Amino acid sequence: ILIVCSFAVGFLKGFLMLWFIRYAQKIFSPKNVRSEFYSYFYPLVYGGGQASMLVTALLAYHYNWKYMYYFMMVLILISILFVIICFRHNRPIKVVAWSDLHIREMFVISAGLLMLMYVINYGKVLDWMASGKICAYIIIAPMLIALFIWYQSRSENPYVSLAPLFQPKAIIGYFYMMLVMFFSTSTTLLTNYLTVILKVDTTHTYSLYTYLLPGYVVGAFICFWWFRWQRWRFRFLIAGGMSCFVIFFAILYFGISPDSTYEMLYLPIFFRGLGMLTLIIAFALFAVEDLNPKYLLSNAFFLIIFRSVLAPILATSFYSNALYRLQQKYMYFLSETITTADPLSATRYNQSLNNAITQGHPYNEAAQLATNSLYNTLQQQSLLLALKEILGYLLVISVVIAVVSRFIPFHKTIRVTFKRTGDDMV
């Protein structure tokens, strides 16, 4: 039921986003300059998402978690009421043929993507090939996606044109935006650090992520004036955006420890927001620079799939699986040295044992509490070591990409020459 409802919400969200873009263009960019519009649009989209998560966390913290859903239901009912009262019903000029709705193509690509996402998300949990569902979806998902591509390549009136996939700039843009979302999703590692090591609750975790908002604002401001002036090479902007991720990973790699503070994370979160939005806006413009305006909706289709669907779920699955594997590796490594012959381990164990006995626990129960205390310490240490290793690799990769991007000849400058912004949802 949840999957079906989420699918319906996403389906309707596409129409709402298209409607919002059509009217927001007139407000944010009366002259229909794409770079100016994106500098307003993307901060609103990503900033609104962060703000909504904070509001729901505050409601769940201060009230019963059910009230959060009651609040959302009330807002939805109010929105429906406004639509009924204020929106004018525009009758279609002509009847739309059933074949023009492309129901078959929508079903095929939706089913294929849902199965692919299920495999990526639950493959490790269900032990991959030991699960019948995973085996079936691994076979069916690529077949459905290939069938969808075959339909579009042979259709005279395709549901989605494949033209953007043959544009080099569009492919480079999709690739870089997937990298950006892969790096940005690394905040899942930070969430583990906050909850396990610093013992921070959900509300304060989401409050920390509000420091992304100043980064979004600064990134949008930089892009607005960078593309208006167009005095510097495009690769300098990309290298600068990647350097923000270098700073983000460097501060986390050298800064996280059991003695670190919550406030220490404000600055890296800011740089993550700055780098993310700068690169998202830059490559959203770069991907459509040489694209025929009639393919803008097709570009939006592929951009949303690569940037907002596949990249986050791939990154989340990778980080969670890598963190679990490395944590188990370091847990085994550290536990080998935990014996009574080790002075530090023996001291910690005896201290916990004596404290439990002093509190009135029987010896057997006190011994169990002391063992659990030592186990929790090992868990924290293994998590820290696993985080350090992953963040170290991410730091090196981001440095390499930042340096390479500095010398990639994207072009001398990016010239935004479109007369109209277009009805796309990127």
Residue map of PLM features:
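Helix-loop-helix hairpins in multi-pass membrane proteins, especially solute transporters
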Residues: 1-105
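A generic transmembrane-helix signature of 12-TM secondary carrier transporters
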Residues: 5-6, 73, 79-80, 242, ...
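Cytoplasmic loop-to-transmembrane helix junctions
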Residues: 32-40, 292-302, 386
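Alpha-helical transmembrane segments of multi-pass secondary-active solute transporters
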Residues: 37, 67-72, 133-137, 205, ...
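Small-residue (Gly/Pro/Ala) motifs that create kinks and tight helix-helix packing interfaces
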Residues: 48-60, 64, 120, 223, ...
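Hydrophobic transmembrane-helix bundles of small-molecule transporters
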Residues: 62-180, 187
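12-transmembrane solute porter fold
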Residues: 159-328
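Hydrophobic transmembrane architecture of multi-pass small-molecule transporters
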Residues: 311-410, 416-426
